[in-house]
Swiss-Prot record:
It comes from Mus musculus. This is Calponin-3. GO terms for cellular component: actin cytoskeleton; cytosol. Residues 279-330 are annotated as: Disordered. SUPFAM superfamilies: Calponin-homology domain, CH-domain. Thin filament-associated protein that is implicated in the regulation and modulation of smooth muscle contraction. It is capable of binding to actin, calmodulin and tropomyosin. The interaction of calponin with actin inhibits the actomyosin Mg-ATPase activity. One of its GO terms (biological process) is epithelial cell differentiation. Belongs to the calponin family. Calponin-like repeats lie at residues 164-189, 204-229, 243-268. The modification N6-acetyllysine is found at residue 23.
């Protein structure tokens, strides 16, 4: 007998193989062994996989359940005839009524690839045989439920077309019935005030929200100047352009009258400087400092209190006396 050479599994393949092997049920194997031996009358042996590997016992099993399912059973020791027996068994149980997802593949049994699936297929086959009336002393497999066909007349079928299940939804709960059109103004009332309910659908409870509170009604355009008043002075605003001091003010400190940025400013202390009594002329310009800043006459008077006499003396008389004997010879 020849065998296929297959090396050990590593990595993910080994992990998957070990996981499949862990699902193998030893008790189910013992029950299947007793059931197959009772139906066929043939011994499987101690090794369940090697006893079913050639496919001979499996072909005899399906022929007992459904006579004539496998016409020819190969008893050769070669690999290909044994694989042919397993393939014939798979076709026979599928024709017997087995579902495709319950059937194992030939390599699962022949190469010991997935004996858990082989075990699942044989248990399902035992349950299908029990459903079809093939009973044994070994209770294995689950009997399938019998199909029950019901027939309804045309009147009941038409009546059922007008009834929909809750899986399709319902129109008996919350809906938008009675809602006003989009954008329509709705009047509000408070149920806590024990007032009567509204007469129409345009009035809703405060629990639904309100559009009567804070708004931008009466607000000025951006950039418009607003007058300010102080609520503590019990002043009343004249119009919507007057706001409280809590909103800020532009009436207090400012930079009005400040000199050009970077220029020096004349400083004096009014405690030590007296106010001027007469006007003062500063270098030909009155009221203007040398640095261009605006200063008063009192500032200049405070800087030079002793040199000021009210006027400047005239050192050069404007009228000259020319006598007869005075002159210039050219």
């Amino acid at each position: 007998m020849t065998h296929f050479n297959k090396g050990p599994s590593y990595g993910l393949s080994a992990e998957v193989k070990n996981k499949i092997a862990s699902k193998y049920d030893q008790q189910a194997e013992e029950d299947l062994r007793n059931w197959i031996e009772e139906v066929t009358g043939l011994g499987i042996g101690t090794n369940f996989q090697l006893g079913l590997k050639d496919g001979i016992i499996l072909c005899e099993l399906i022929n007992k359940l459904q006579p004539g399912s496998v016409k020819k059973v190969n008893e050769s020791s070669l690999n290909w005839p044994q694989l042919e027996n397993i393939g014939n068994f798979i076709k026979a149980i599928q024709a017997y009524g087995m579902k495709p997802h319950d059937i194992f593949e030939a390599n699962d049994l022949f190469e010991n690839g997935n004996m858990t699936q082989v075990q699942t297929t044989l248990v399902a086959l035992a349950g299908l045989a029990k459903t079809k009336g093939f009973h044994t002393t070994i209770d294995i497999g689950v009997k399938y439920a019998e199909k029950q066909t019901r027939r309804f007349d045309e009147g009941k079928l038409k009546a059922g077309q007008s009834v929909i299940g809750l899986q399709m939804g319902t129109n008996k709960c919350a809906s938008q019935a009675g809602m006003t059109a989009y954008g329509t103004r709705r009047h509000l009332y408070d149920p806590k005030m024990q007032t009567d309910k509204p007469f129409d659908q345009t009035t809703i409870s405060l629990q639904m929200g309100t559009n009567k509170g804070a708004s931008q009604a009466g607000m000025l355009a951006p950039g418009t100047r607003r007058d300010i008043y102080d609520q503590k002075l019990t002043l009343q605003p004249v119009d919507n352009s007057t706001i409280s001091l809590q909103m800020g003010t532009n009436k207090v400190a400012s930079q009005k009258g400040m000199s050009v940025y970077g220029l020096g400013r004349q400083v004096y202390d009014p405690k030590y400087c007296a106010a001027p009594t007469e006007p003062v002329i500063h270098n030909g310009s009155q009221g203007t400092g040398t640095n261009g800043s605006e200063i008063s006459d009192s500032d200049y008077q405070a800087e030079y209190p002793d040199e000021y006499h009210g006027e400047y003396p005239d050192d050069y008389p404007r009228e000259y006396q020319y006598g007869d004997d005075q002159g210039i010879d050219y």
